[in-house]
């Protein structure tokens, strides 16, 4: 990358601005990074404009080159980040995280559009960890194609861990083919775990819509809760649909739930 980084005494790359955040993928998605201060990413609203509108920030890590390192936010916040990639998969500040770790970071007032595996912080975790982190803002997916796995914090948790984290997002997934939307996690699957986490999100979707998790499949939710408003088919205050021995322990929901069937 053409962006320079300093390293701290532990050899971690220091991220001090939004350009350094954007260039993590080019600098090395297998490296370790630390956020040294809050970042206002308002400028991303004008990034990557091809004449038909700005696509904004390019998610860190994708399916072919996922983020595999560690990112420690040190309790700092990234605010006003903008992503408009309505045909894309693996969309979030981090698009795809494989066996990597994202911790101690807040994403405030994010604005994201995408199609599949979309989250306020991470699009998809594959065996990795998101801990002590949160996201707030707007995730709005509208497509005539099939869109799935959309969450306020994490789109899909595939065998990974989400712990001590929360989301307060407006998550809207419209379109007749759209499924799996959750206030915190869209789909929790393959022994994924969600622990000590909560969502106060407003969640709207077509099918398999949950205040915390849209679909909990062969996975676990522990000591977590949701208080948001949920609207959709297969709608649940905590979980939209449970399958294949998925478990929920010491968790609850108190939000308003409106179930509706496609076509209503």
Set out the residue ranges of the language-model regions.
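Surface-exposed repetitive/solenoidal architectures
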Residues: 1-264
């Amino acid at each position: 990358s053409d962006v320079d980084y300093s390293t701290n005494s532990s050899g971690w790359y220091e991220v001090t601005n939004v350009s350094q955040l954007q260039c993590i993928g080019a600098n090395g998605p297998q490296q370790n990074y630390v956020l040294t201060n809050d970042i206002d990413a308002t400028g991303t609203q004008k990034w990557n404009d091809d004449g038909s509108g700005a696509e904004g920030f390019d998610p860190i890590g994708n399916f072919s080159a996922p983020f595999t390192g560690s990112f420690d936010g040190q309790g700092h916040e990234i605010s006003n980040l903008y992503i408009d990639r309505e045909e894309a998969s693996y969309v979030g500040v981090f698009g795809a995280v494989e066996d990597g770790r994202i911790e101690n970071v807040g994403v405030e007032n994010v604005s994201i559009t995408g199609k599949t595996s979309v989250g306020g912080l991470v699009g998809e975790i594959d065996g990795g960890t998101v801990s002590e982190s949160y996201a707030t803002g707007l995730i709005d997916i509208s497509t005539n194609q099939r869109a799935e796995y959309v969450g306020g914090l994490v789109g899909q948790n595939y065998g990974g861990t989400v712990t001590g984290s929360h989301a307060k997002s407006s998550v809207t997934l419209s379109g007749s083919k759209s499924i799996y939307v959750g206030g915190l996690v869209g789909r929790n699957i393959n022994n994924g775990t969600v622990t000590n986490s909560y969502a106060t999100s407003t969640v709207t979707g077509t099918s398999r819509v949950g205040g915390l998790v849209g679909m909990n499949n062969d996975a676990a939710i522990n000591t977590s809760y949701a208080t948001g408003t949920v609207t959709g088919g297969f709608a649940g205050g905590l979980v939209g649909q449970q399958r294949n021995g998925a478990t929920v322990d010491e968790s609850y929901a108190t939000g308003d739930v409106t179930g509706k069937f496609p076509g209503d």
